[in-house]
Amino acid sequence: MKYVEGFVENIIFRNEDNGYTVFNIVYDDEEITCVGVLSYINTGEFITAQGEFVKHAVYYMQFKVTSYEFRAPDDAASVRRYLSSGAIKGIGEKMAERIVKTFGDDTFRIMEEEPERLAEIKGISMSKAMDIANQLIDKKDIRKAMMFLQRYGIQMNLANKIFKRYGNDIYNILEQNPYRLADDIEGVGFRTADEIASRAGIKIDSEFRIKSGIFYVLNQATMQGHTYLPYDKLVRQVNELLLIDVQDYDKYLMDLTMDKKIVVKVKDNIKCVYARMYYNMEANVAAMLNNLDVQIEEDQKFIDDRIARIEDKEGITLDDIQKEAVAKAVRNGLVIVTGGPGTGKTTTINTIIKYFELEGLEIRLAAPTGRAAKRMTEACGYEAQTIHRMLEISGGVPDGDRKSAAAGLSMFFERNEDNPLEADVIIVDEMSMVDISIMNSLLKAVSIGTKLILVGDVDQLPSVGPGNVLKDIIESGCFPVVKLERIFRQAAQSEIIINAHKINRGEEVVLNKYSKDFLFVHRNGADNIINAMKTLIKDKLPDYVGADVYDLQILTPSRKSNVGVERLNKIMQDFLNPADAIKQERQVGDVTFREGDKVMQIKNDYQLTWEKRSRYGIPTEQGTGAFNGDTGVIERISTFDENVTVKFEDGRFVTYEFSQLDELELAYAITVHKSQGSEYPAVIIPMSQGPRMLMNRNILYTAVTRARKCVCLVGEEEIFRLMAGNVSESKRYSSLADRIEEIRYIEDFGQ
């Protein structure tokens, strides 16, 4: 580490949101450009900064500050310089000269300790003297806080967030319960808070640490798709996290229950522990679904005649199950339509749309992702939106608490129970990937009396987010469900569809490289598999399916294996978008982002702003929100502005500060989970050994059904057979079905 010191000559740039500052300091006539998160420095101040010199591509050498200390002015010249800088509102150059002339080297002490004496100077009233004193106190408090936080090893960008949140309460919080940071501050998890607590001398068996650990494990479980954990599993994971043998868990669970942070329920003699937010979501969703489940009387002959009229006009023929789906949509407020590829879901939904159009009803279509919404629009000839956009997402976050935003709560949508959607019928496709938080937000915006039709393939992978919404709704047995199973003639010509159903039913699939749309390229060993994939994605498949290279997608079950996402992305980046002197880059950890890279948003960020642009680059539409699974291409990396601009597939341009790049990852290869709701002209799937829990039928089925024109499996046939035969799946702990059944029981028995 190196040190530089001097007077802050001028602030060149400051991002008021994150505190990133570019400034010059001067000492002994030498000027040094410094950069870092220093929200609270001002021109005229004398600082000692710690950091390293870095070479900027445009602006040559800069000093990257990691920590700093302020030195109070200690002579007349430095006081004059500080006061003349404008750091203290109400003091200009002339006033600064008068103050220093009166008090000399003792000026700064008098301003801090005897501020009333400033009123001795012409032009300064007693109230102005007190205002100057208060400004100095505020600045001193900030500097003291920054130094205090740095002693705990807290980096300046995080120190900035902590001080903004707590102000002068930071001393009590860090010395008594640093684990509050994990609850309140975005970017602080349990592990960061635990490290700070260790430096603060908090005991490893502190009740604050144990309760924070319990809550952390529950929240981590939601990242794995769970809405609760069984007691024994929770205890085991908390003990592993804390590295202590915690006694009397029931006491801590009771405390957390009293604090309204968790809920404990007993199911089949098993104690189930929920983060309260997710328990409430499941309970709310169950209640709202129940409210929508109303029956409407309608003459069967009238329904049959209208369906026949639509069939005749559209030149289609529905089978009996499809007609049943239409009739149930007419007669019920809530209907679920499920089925695999080629079973006529689109034809059924189109008929339902035509039916309600004849009724003159207002219809809204939605899907979880931009890709899925685009597909729905193309298939139905009726505009579909993402669920987020239909609900009119808002970038505002109550009280600046972005931690809550990550949960996807309905408070971040303009459409809610107080401002419901204006629609008579709402149809939502790709329901298998809708998690409990989005379902909660959606249902809040649906009025009683509005028909809700949920469509999806229950055999697909469940949502990335917590819950198992579609499966739980169906398994509750409480709502009308229609399962489409017949494969129609046109679909029966597609080996993708035929083989997908064979995989799902556990039937034998014939593999060869001569199929027109379901190819198997035999290769042994990860390197040989990857080389074959390179040839396919660049030289063979684009012309074969008539698509751009970036429209094709490599899907792989895992992240860490020899053919996992991380390794494949590095290899495919170098192959498809190699480094070039004219391409700007940005390194983030082990990943290099490069102009021209294919990237994916990997978390929901409700505050990111976006714009759409005309062909001339003029903004034509603006909004907020970028969502998990959105894919695009890096258009520009600016080392001067320290940001990256991505153009997403739907035409949105989003600019990320360098500090936000953890929200992106390369997307030449993505996990099968991340592909949910998407469809690609062709998919390439490596068949190589990976983690057994991911080598299952559900993953394979989901992967092959992502392809529209061609599936290309590359690797070892025995791996394909292993996956197709492995029906075990990772247990997902969710209880929406239980909550639905509870409500029905109460309705039926009044208890």
Predicted regions and their residues:
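Conserved helicase motor core of P-loop NTPases
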Residues: V458-T624
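Short aromatic-glycine-enriched beta-strand elements
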Residues: R14-I25, F640-T645
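Conserved helicase motor core of SF1/SF2 NTP-dependent helicases
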Residues: Y355, E359-L361, G370-K374, A379, ...
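Structural detector for short beta-strands of small beta-barrel domains
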Residues: M1-N15, G51, T631-E635
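Pre-P-loop entry segment of helicase/translocase ATPase cores
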Residues: Q150, N219-Q220, V264-E324, G396-V397
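Accessory alpha-helical DNA-binding modules that contact the DNA backbone or grooves
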Residues: Y20-D28, T33-C34, N42-E52, A57-K271, ...
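C-terminal accessory regions
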Residues: R505, E621-G623, N628-Q751
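Conserved RecA-like ASCE P-loop NTPase motor core of nucleic-acid helicases/translocases
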Residues: V335-T377, V455, F518-G525, K540-S561
